[in-house]
């Protein structure tokens, strides 16, 4: 009986873990992101927003399998960059996020630098924005809004410098 309960518990836990994973990238998914933001929000010291540049162009010119490969490659870059207290998520499409718990500003800066370095080793690029709580606890909605704004500003600079029309990308 004890073995049956242990096996049942293991299978239930395994199924629950699958519901939190993005099957393409292996990162946690959007559902897990919002659940984790609600779980001990006072421990969240920074949020990082990431968005792949040019995914639509890859999908249109090389096919969706190539786009999936690009997303998986970027996800591996993000996973390599993560350290203790940092969790990576695929929010959907070409959008990603990282929650940093009990990480200093310096650790968050180092995370973003590692991401930029790892992505630079690939043929792809992404726009990154982040927001740190600082000394005083802040609402996660504010952190998310600020990191998204920073990421979208970087994305706009990417499109301006590349001369590409972001509406087609």
Where are these predicted regions, by residue range?
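Residue-level recognition of strand-loop junctions within catalytic nucleotide-signaling folds
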Residues: 60, 100-103, 133-134
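Catalytic-core segments of nucleotide cyclases and related cyclic-nucleotide turnover enzymes
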Residues: 105, 109-116, 127, 132-169
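Hydrophobic framework residues that shape the active-site pocket
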Residues: 55, 74, 96, 128
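Signal-transducing coiled-coil linker helices
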Residues: 1-24, 31-45
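A short pre-motif secondary-structure segment
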Residues: 87-90
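Short catalytic/binding micro-motifs of nucleotide second-messenger systems
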Residues: 80-85, 111-125
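Active-site-proximal alpha-helical element of nucleotidyl cyclase-like catalytic domains
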Residues: 66-85
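Conserved nucleotide-binding and Mg2+-coordinating catalytic segments in signaling enzymes
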Residues: 15-35, 50-64, 69-72
């Amino acid at each position: 009986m004890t073995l049956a309960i242990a096996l049942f518990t293991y299978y239930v836990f395994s199924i629950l873990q699958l519901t939190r994973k993005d099957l393409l990238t292996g990162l946690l998914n959007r559902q897990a992101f919002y659940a984790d933001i609600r779980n001990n929000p006072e421990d969240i010291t920074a949020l990082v927003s990431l968005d792949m540049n040019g995914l639509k162009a890859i999908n249109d010119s090389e096919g969706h399998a190539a786009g999936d490969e690009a997303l998986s490659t970027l996800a591996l870059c993000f996973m390599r960059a993560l350290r203790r207290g940092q969790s990576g998520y695929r929010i959907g499409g070409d959008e990603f996020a990282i929650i940093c718990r009990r990480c200093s500003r310096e650790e968050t800066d180092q995370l973003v630098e590692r991401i930029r370095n790892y992505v630079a080793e690939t043929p792809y690029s992404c726009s990154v924005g982040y927001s740190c709580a600082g000394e005083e606890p802040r609402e996660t909605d504010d952190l998310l809004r600020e990191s998204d704004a920073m990421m979208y500003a970087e994305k706009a600079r990417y499109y301006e410098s590349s001369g590409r029309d972001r509406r087609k990308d």
